[in-house]
Design a protein with these regions (language model features):
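C-terminal substrate-binding/cap subdomain adjacent to the FAD-binding core in PCMH-type
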Residues: 138-330, 345
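Substrate-recognition/cap regions that form aromatic- and gly/pro-loop-enriched pockets
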Residues: 292-408
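C-terminal structured subdomain/cap of oxidoreductase catalytic cores
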Residues: 45, 144-149, 153-168, 175-176, ...
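Solvent-exposed alpha-helices and their adjacent loops that cap or buttress functional pockets
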Residues: 19, 38, 56-57, 74-77, ...
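Short, Lys/Arg-enriched N-terminal segments with co-localized hydrophobic residues
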Residues: 1-5
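Structural signature of FAD isoalloxazine-binding scaffolds in flavoprotein oxidoreductases
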Residues: 54-73, 127-147, 173-180
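Glycine-rich N-terminal segment of FAD-binding domains in flavoprotein oxidoreductases
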Residues: 17-112, 121-127, 351, 403
Length: 409
């Protein structure tokens, strides 16, 4: 077994948001035999590509990485069904399937997640309906605590199946997943961006959702009972020209020192972040393209593959929670007042209409999901306590796959 023991003087960021650091022992099993030997250990977690925002990928003792389990086991191009080991990255799946006329039916905001991580977190995307990966999974193979390989489907070993999707590895180690793909004619996306300047206009614009496949909403400002931002809608281009089924040409870049320095200033300053959001909203509609590339639409944050570094050594935390529609305006106004009074801010606030049934640890319910990226600074503790008070007051469901601030209550 290949062991990496982190040096005690070096703190290692265990999640993408960089808000928790430790020096764990990390094991990279190369095959099933080595993995079974490790399963006899206690107090460890399974990790994929460690792109989680929250603390669900954190263990200060032992981490078992599935990065060596990176084979695509089967791809049926005719039926649009793929089976891949849990360590395979989504970007590698897309590189294989998109040029043949298929795409994943649900995708998070980054291609650099592992298949096992997508299942364990039951990822959701911009889809207006069937918004979670659970709707498209056909079969899972799990190595349980007894070192038995369990095959489960929606009808076979159903409890294992339902508990594993969104279960954060509590049922065992996900070995592979088989899921249904979505047929596409092009990697191009038809998109529409509409500006809203009030709650009424926001709700009115959302009525257009049935004309599209995807929607996400970006908040620029919310204050004194008002709200401003942009609604993004999209659907796959139906042009049947085969030349549009081409490989990705999206070139990722790393943030260099100069850009890092400038961006860090903007992500740490209350007034500059407000100015940036205002400028973005005003000019985005002018320069946006009616037809967008696949990567531009689904993975804009991957343009800078190390964008998380702009928050500095303390990192940030992402709060994502689900509020009922009748409480939405009240909660947004309370958050706005808190941010204004404390001169604190969220660099991004994303709102999405949400309607999912579920159970166990899954993120489900009906209403609006609110997602905020908040830099960790001197106001962190006060912000955390405020959000927890909101969670409790309104009995709000928190997305555990991204959470690192919710208290036990």
């Amino acid at each position: 077994i290949h062991l990496i023991i982190m040096k005690s003087q070096s703190n290692f960021s265990l999640n993408w948001s960089g808000n928790t650091k430790a020096t764990p022992r990390i094991i990279y099993p190369k095959n099933l035999e080595e993995l079974k030997k490790i399963m006899a250990e206690k107090n460890f977690i399974i990790a994929g590509n460690q792109r989680s925002f929250g603390d669900n990928s954190i263990n200060t003792n032992l981490i078992v990485s599935m990065k060596n389990f990176k084979q695509v086991l089967n791809f049926d191009k005719a039926k649009g069904i793929i089976e891949a080991q849990s360590g395979v990255l989504l970007k590698d799946v897309l590189g294989l399937i998109v040029e043949t006329g298929w795409c994943v039916p649900v995708t998070p905001g980054s291609k650099y997640v592992s298949i096992g991580g997508m299942v364990a977190n039951n990822v959701h995307g911009k889809n207006i309906t069937n918004n979670q990966i659970k709707h498209h999974i056909l079969e899972l193979k799990i190595l349980n605590e007894n070192n038995e390989i369990v095959t489960c489907t929606p009808t076979q070993n159903k409890n294992y199946f339902e508990s594993t999707i969104g279960g954060f590895g509590l049922t065992g180690c996900i070995l592979s997943a088989k899921f249904r793909l979505k047929k596409i004619n092009s990697i191009l996306m038809n998109q529409e961006i509409l500006e809203f300047t009030s709650y009424n206009s926001f709700f009115s614009i959302l009525e257009k959702s049935n004309l599209y496949e995807y929607n996400v909403n970006w908040i620029e400002s919310f204050d004194n009972g008002s709200i401003k931002g942009l609604c993004y809608f999209g659907k796959h281009e139906n042009n049947n020209n085969s030349h549009t089924l081409q490989k990705f040409n999206f070139k990722e870049k790393e943030i260099n020192f100069f850009n890092y320095f400038i961006l860090k200033i903007f992500t740490q300053n209350y007034y500059l972040i407000k100015l940036t959001k205002f400028i973005f909203r005003k000019f985005k509609k002018i320069f946006y393209k009616k037809v967008s590339g696949f990567d531009e639409f689904f993975y804009p944050q991957d343009y800078f593959i190390n964008w998380n570094k702009i928050y500095g050594k303390n990192g940030f935390f992402q709060a994502q929670f689900l509020v009922k529609e009748n409480n939405f305006k009240d909660i947004m106004n309370k958050i706005a007042k808190f941010f204004k009074d404390e001169k604190n801010f969220s660099t991004f606030i994303i709102i999405k209409k949400f309607d999912e049934k579920g159970k166990y640890l899954n993120f489900y319910g009906q209403g609006f999901s609110i997602s905020m990226d908040i830099p960790i600074n001197s106001k962190f503790e006060k912000t955390k306590n405020f959000l927890n008070s909101i969670f409790q007051e309104y009995d709000i469901k928190v997305n555990f796959s991204k959470d690192s601030i919710a208290n036990k209550d």
